[in-house]
A protein has these predicted regions:
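Structural signature of tandem-repeat unit edges
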Residues: 41-48, 66-80, 90-103, 113-126, ...
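LRR flanking "cap" motifs
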Residues: 24-79, 332
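Consensus positions within tandem repeat domains that build extended binding/scaffold surfaces
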Residues: 82-87, 105-110, 128-133, 151-156, ...
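Positively charged n-region of N-terminal signal peptides that target proteins for export
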Residues: 1-4, 406
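Bacterial N-terminal signal peptides
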Residues: 7-15
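Secondary-structure capping and domain/repeat boundary segments
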Residues: 307-365
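C-terminal outer-membrane/trafficking sorting elements
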Residues: 365-406
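Boundary at the C-terminal end of the N-terminal hydrophobic targeting segment
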Residues: 18-20
Length: 406
């Protein structure tokens, strides 16, 4: 009889017929679960909060069967995703979190390496620590406007993540929240954020520019450490603290714009391995002298004052249509021995793609300059006398760069 049973099982298997196993139980006061191993679906039914688990030996009841799970169905009416709920469900491909959920627990989806899509419901207010860490299949994430806090390590080492949209209610980005997201190329930090945690974006090598809004008061240590692709950073005017190594090893930085009226007191390692002789530091025009005297900031060779201008758009009848504020970054003028740079002269006052500028110099008293002077250090640079001043004509066009602020 045993031989016949073995034969029949083998026959069913060879015909592609497999026997489904059903596992079930409770996962909350009013929630139950059922796992069908044949269709790889874990179905949660009921309403209310899910139980929290805490790891060995306290695992979710389906943890031993996690290798079967590819799909999870969550009901409208569930209000929380428990701690460690779906940790290490490496076959899970996507998750849709219903609008009834208000909280995603710590480690809830940690290690779900096959997950390529996540939809976060519009009533979620908190994303727990390590909630989506090591979800290495994720390429984009939208955090809805309902969320107020992103936990520590929330998306840590999601190294295929290329873009993140952070909702406009988030007040804090946790430590290492996006650390190691090396493919991240775009992130917009909303005006609601006040704190950027330690290591929040460390080793995000794909980032090329970051704007830290005026709402932020503190940038944590190592927040952008090792972001070697970062070329431009704008620091809002409310930032009072910048932690150690915040921008260390950001070797590609060419522009740092700091709107703080008073230079922050920072450690010498904040900009370690940033080339301060080529990276331009843009500051408020009236604060230039303060930065030139402040520790660390004074190490930047090129400290340039910037101005804000309101640009008004009018129709043909001069009726105002719209206005916005633009920050104009004045380029760094060439240094020419024997001459002192005194300012920029505009060729046109009409702002289109940029204002064309001419560098204006005065000859030093000890230097006798001809009407046309060729810089021996760079023959392409010629100074032409115009009254009591000299104007640089080097075949280049210098333009103020306009950046939208509001």
């Amino acid at each position: 009889m045993k031989k016949i049973s073995i034969f029949l099982l083998a026959l069913f298997a060879s015909a592609g017929i497999t026997q489904a196993s059903i596992f079930d139980g409770s996962c909350g006061a009013n929630l139950t679960w059922s796992l069908n191993t044949q269709d790889s679906t874990l179905t949660i039914t009921g309403s209310g909060e899910m139980t929290n688990w805490h790891g060995d030996p306290d695992f979710a009841p389906w943890y031993d069967y996690k290798s079967y799970i590819k799909y999870v169905s969550l009901p409208d009416g569930i209000t929380s995703i428990g701690d460690w709920a779906f940790r290490d469900c490496s076959g899970l491909t996507s998750i849709e979190i219903p609008n009834s959920v208000t909280g995603i627990g710590s480690d809830a989806f940690d290690g779900c390496s096959s997950m390529t899509s996540v939809t976060i419901g519009n009533r979620v207010t908190s994303i727990g620590n390590t909630a989506f860490s090591y979800c290495t299949g994720l390429t984009s994430v939208t955090i809805p406007n309902s969320v107020t806090g992103i936990g520590d390590y929330a998306f840590y080492e999601c190294y295929r993540l290329t873009s993140v949209t952070i909702g406009n209610s988030v007040t804090g980005i946790g430590s290492s929240a996006f650390g190691g997201c090396s493919s991240l190329t775009s992130v917009t930090i909303p005006n609601s954020v006040t704190i950027i945690g330690e290591g929040a974006f460390f080793l995000c090598n794909g980032l090329t520019s970051v704007t830290i809004p005026n709402s932020v008061t503190s940038i944590g240590g190592s927040a952008f450490l090792g972001c070697s692709g970062l070329s431009s950073v704008t620091i809002g005017n409310s930032v009072t603290g910048i932690g150690d190594k915040a921008f260390k090893d950001c070797t590609g930085l060419t522009f740092v714009t700091n709107y703080a009226a008073t230079p922050q007191s920072i450690n010498s390692n904040v900009f370690d391995n940033v080339n301060k002789s080529t990276c331009v530091l843009n500051v408020a025009k009236e604060s230039v002298s303060l930065y030139q005297a402040a520790n660390v900031w004074k190490d930047f060779t090129n400290i340039v004052g910037v101005d804000d201008y309101t640009i008004n758009y009018v129709d043909k009848d001069s009726q105002a249509l719209y206005n916005h504020v633009v920050t104009l970054y004045v380029p760094v003028a060439p240094t020419i021995t024997g001459f002192t740079f005194v300012g920029w002269q505009t060729v046109s006052t009409m702002l289109t793609d940029g204002i064309t500028l001419q560098a204006v110099y005065q000859a030093d008293e000890s230097f006798s300059a001809p009407a046309v002077y060729t810089n021996p250090a760079n023959p392409a640079q010629k100074l032409s006398k115009n009254g009591n001043i000299y104007i640089l004509t080097d075949g280049k066009t210098y333009n103020m760069q306009g950046q939208l602020v509001k």
